[in-house]
């Protein structure tokens, strides 16, 4: 059956001027309002390396880098080449009754850099990673509890939101996952008290809290690791 090829670049060029109106109608009207309020409804057109370019060609230094997704820069030539080679190879991807060769290669490479590990579990986002960590911790320890810190942000899916200590995100979605307890960030005494019940499967913590950019003391994370080992908590 004949078909026409989709030219995504042409489609982008045709509709980019309507991006705000389309999002306001069909996606997230509030985000459109916020971008206009803070002056960022600039219509980014291109990303190269560490820079973004708006509709007028103004260049911006991208210090966010997609929350770390673009750690090697946007549209890096080596990454573009790798993606193109995958598309051109017609690999049998996402076959239910098979295992992935490339996933095996990546897991092997990762473990070469972290030889204290035996297995790898891949996830597609931070929130999904937190969800998996909750399951692994409860399954491995047989314990129900999860401890996290005040002012934390771990994601917006159900389990991850249960560990996100921010009313603005949680409001309207409670009750959330039971067994989750918040302690003050940087407070080893509070952590000791929370773990001493030996009912806590895991302590999930950000090395640096992104919401507010709260830094731990030099003693907090090593001390937390020691307490987790003491009480059998992951």
PLM-predicted stretches and their roles:
Residues 2-48, 102:
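Active-site-adjacent loop/helix segments that line or gate small-molecule/cofactor pockets in enzymes
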Residues 6, 31, 59-147:
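Glycine-rich loop-to-alpha-helix module at the N-terminal edge of alpha/beta enzyme cores
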Residues 41-62:
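Active-site and channel-lining beta-strand-loop segments
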Residues 58, 202, 233-234:
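Hydrophobic "anchor" residues on beta-strands that sit immediately upstream
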Residues 66, 89-90, 188, 207-211:
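A short, flexible beta-alpha/helix-coil linker loop
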Residues 69-72, 210-214:
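Short, small-residue-enriched loops and turns at beta-alpha junctions
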Residues 107-202, 209-211, 222-226:
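PLP-dependent aspartate aminotransferase-fold enzymes
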Residues 215-234:
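Catalytic PLP-binding core of fold-type I/II PLP enzymes
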């Amino acid at each position: 059956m004949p078909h026409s090829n989709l030219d995504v670049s042409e489609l982008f060029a045709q509709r980019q001027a309507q991006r705000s109106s389309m999002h306001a109608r069909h996606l997230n009207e509030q985000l459109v309002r916020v971008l206009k309020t803070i002056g960022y409804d600039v219509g980014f057109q291109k990303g190269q390396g560490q820079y973004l370019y708006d509709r007028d060609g103004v260049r911006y230094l991208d210090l966010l880098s997609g929350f770390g997704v673009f750690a090697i820069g946007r549209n890096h030539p080596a990454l573009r080449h790798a993606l193109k080679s995958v598309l051109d190879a017609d690999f049998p991807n996402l076959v239910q009754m098979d295992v992935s060769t490339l996933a095996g290669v990546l897991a092997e490479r990762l473990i070469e850099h972290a030889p204290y590990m035996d297995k790898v579990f891949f996830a597609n986002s931070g929130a999904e990673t937190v969800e998996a960590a909750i399951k692994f911790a409860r399954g491995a320890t047989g314990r129900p509890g999860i401890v996290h810190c005040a002012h934390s942000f771990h994601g917006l899916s159900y389990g991850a939101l249960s560990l996100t200590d921010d009313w603005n995100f949680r409001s309207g979605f409670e009750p959330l996952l039971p067994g989750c307890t918040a302690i003050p960030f940087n407070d080893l005494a509070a952590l000791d008290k929370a773990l001493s019940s030996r009912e806590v499967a895991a302590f999930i913590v950000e090395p640096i809290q992104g919401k507010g950019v709260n830094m731990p003391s030099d003693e907090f994370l090593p001390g937390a690791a020691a307490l987790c080992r003491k009480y059998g908590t992951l």
